[in-house]
Amino acid sequence: MKEIGRTRSGLQMGYTTGSCAAAAAKAAAEMLLSGEEIRQVRLLTPKGIELYLELEEIMRKKSEVSCAVRKYSGDDPDVTNGILVYATVQKVEKKSKINSENSVDLSEKINLDGGIGIGRVTKPGLEQKIGQAAINKVPRRMICEAVEEVCRKYEYTGNLQVRLSVPEGAEVAKKTFNPRLGIEGGISILGTTGIVEPMSEKALTDTIYLEMKMLKENGTDWCYVVPGNYGMDFLRKKLHVDTAFSVKCSNYVGETIEDAKLLGMKGILLIGHIGKFIKLAAGVMNTHSRQADCRMEVLGVHAAMNGAGAAVVWEIMDCINTTEAMEILRREKLIEPVMESVMKRIEFFLKNRAGEELEIGVILFSTEDGILGKSENADELLKKIQENR
């Protein structure tokens, strides 16, 4: 396989399970509609990187074709590395004949479902509805676009069903967080860019330092700090600001604050999703789930502080993610007071870590509610960063 590329730290990139699924679906559709066997498929990822992926386990019938793409994680220590992701594409006369009430219509003509080794959602709060296959929205879009491309090529206007499967999925899923998330029976099909960009912890923290150092050396004294793509998208699409003055910190909030102090930055504004940044209210400065997962404890305590009864607190403690917990707070009309007290604790811990030499602020958001809370100096910091005076 041709090397995909390397990160700035020299580590080999890989590709996601979403890319595997989209590539396998595209190849199966190509063979089904052309009647000819192919051994390699081209896929353009959302990141803009072209992949040329080898096909395995090809099985062709008159009305359906299946094939597999092997997952490659590069230098990322990913438990899904090396597994085969299968796609079966089948012609169907009418979508009403599809035998699964939990399948998903990607378009008027294309239906998607998961088979063996693809996890099923059993609890609310995830991207998919209960009962549906754990195939996230970006991979769904990738699969739809890939199959539609083939349909246009062969001027096919009939209905197709795509079924994904991962024979090793149930076993591999035991090594992931899926059981804790309420996803049973297999792995999730994931990915936001289609590409796996691995980083060792040291390489990642070194990169954070270098990114901030470059800003500083180019005359920037104030910057945004976001964990990753969600924060970056929020900057662009919701706050409508220039992301040139931003640094991705991943899970390393504490290290990033120390870097800012060491480099002599005047101030930083942290902007993050509640799923990560709620942990800051407990003083947790490395937000990776391996380090600590106090999300429900924080929300439960602050709900109790604002009048929630024991039953509500226990309900929050049983949630699998912050989206589900926020629905409970919304029902109890507690979002505003809880976010107010949460923000006070976040500010306390951030200011304690930053000290007097670094001005620090924070904006907390969710996909559903937008801005949930912000520090008193957040608007002022936004202005300073955009002006960089």
Segment roles from a protein language model:
Residues R60-S63, Y86-T88, I130-A133, R180-G185, ...:
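Short, low-complexity, polar/charged sequence segments that are solvent-exposed and flexible
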Residues K109, R140, M343-R389:
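Extended hydrophobic packing segments that form well-structured cores
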Residues K2-G5, Q12-G18, L181-I187, T192-V342, ...:
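A structural signal for small-residue-enriched, beta-sheet-centric alpha/beta enzyme cores
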Residues E171, M232, I371:
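Flexible, glycine-rich phosphate/dinucleotide-binding loops
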Residues R152-K153, D233, K237, E327, ...:
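Polar/charged alpha-helical tracts
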Residues M1-K175, P179-L181:
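Generic N-terminal targeting/processing segments that precede catalytic cores or assembly contacts
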